Amino acid sequence: MVLQGCSNNDNDDWLKYHQQLGDALNSTPVENTEPDNIPSFPETQRLVFEIEEMREGMLNIYALRGCQITSLIAARNNQLGKVAPPSQQWLYERELWQQLSSCWNTDTPEQLSEENRERLLDMTMSKTAQLPYVSWNAVFESTEWQKSFSRASTPLSSTTLADIDPALEALDYLRRMTLHQFDRQWEQDSGRLENHLKELNERPLSAEILRALLLASQRLDEASLMLEQASAECLPDWDMTGVQQLENVAHQWLKAVNRLVDSHPIAPPAAWQDYQHNWLSLTNDEAPWRIFNSALNRHQAMRSQFTVCPE
C-alpha cells in the first residue's frame, strides 16, 4: 500500500517496520492513514509591514549631496529600482541608512543650513526606525521564503536528510545580516545574499520537514497500536537510524528558523506569530515537533515492555 502524497521510499521504510512488527507479533499490520497536509501559508499582506516611502524631492536630496546619497536615491527611484525584489530593496535601504548615519556622525551637518541639517536628521531617524521592518519584509515577502512552506510538497525523504547544510547556511546568513543591520562596519554582499536565497528556493524544505514529522508521528502511533494488541513476549531489534536522522534534522531546521525570526528586534505580525506557534514551535505540545517526540517516546516506552528476540 503506497500512500498518496508521500515518497515511495519513506512509505516503504514505515511499511517494512509495520510488517516486521506484524511478523513478530503474528498479526496483521494496522491500516495506514495518510496524515493531513500542512495548512496554507499566510497571505503575504498579512506577513509584512507597510513601509512609508521617503517623499523628498531631488532638489532637497541634492542639497545633501555631501552625504553621497544622491545617486543611490536616484537609482532607487528609477523604474528598475521600484520593481526590485525584496532582497535588493533590503540592500538599498541598509546602504542608504549606512550613508545617512555615517554622514550624520561627521562634520558634514555643520556645513549645512539649519533647514537641511534638520532634513538630514529627520531622514536619518526615519530610516533608522524603518530598517528593522524593511529587514523583516525582505525575508517574509520573498518568494524564496514562502516557497519553503509550500503545501505542494512531500515529506522529506530519508535519502535527502543529510542535504540541508546549504539551506542552514542560508538561514544563518539571513540571521547574521539581520543582527548586523545597524553595524556600519559590516559589509553586505549582494551576490552572497542572492545565492543563499537561491538555495532556499531549491525546495520547500520547511514543508518537507513538517510533513515528515506528521508522517512519522502517524506511523509511530499506528505501530504503537499494534503493540497494544500484542501478546508476544519479544520483538526484533529496531534500526532507528532513519528516525534519529529525522529527529536531528528537524530540530536543527526548526531551531534555525526560530533563531532567524527571533533575530528581528520587532514584534512579528499576528499571522506569523500564529503560524510559528502552531507549526514551528519546539515547545508547543500541539505543534508537529512535540507531537513527533511524544509519539516516539510513547512507542519506545511500549517497546521497552518487550524483550529483544534472539536472531
Model-derived features: where do they sit?
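Hydrophilic extracytoplasmic domains
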Residues: 251-311
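Generic hydrophobic, helix-prone segments enriched in Leu/Val/Ile
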Residues: 17-21, 100, 213-225, 275, ...
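Extended amphipathic alpha-helical interaction segments
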Residues: 123-265
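Cysteine-centric signal of extracytoplasmic or virion-exposed proteins
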Residues: 67, 103, 234, 309-310
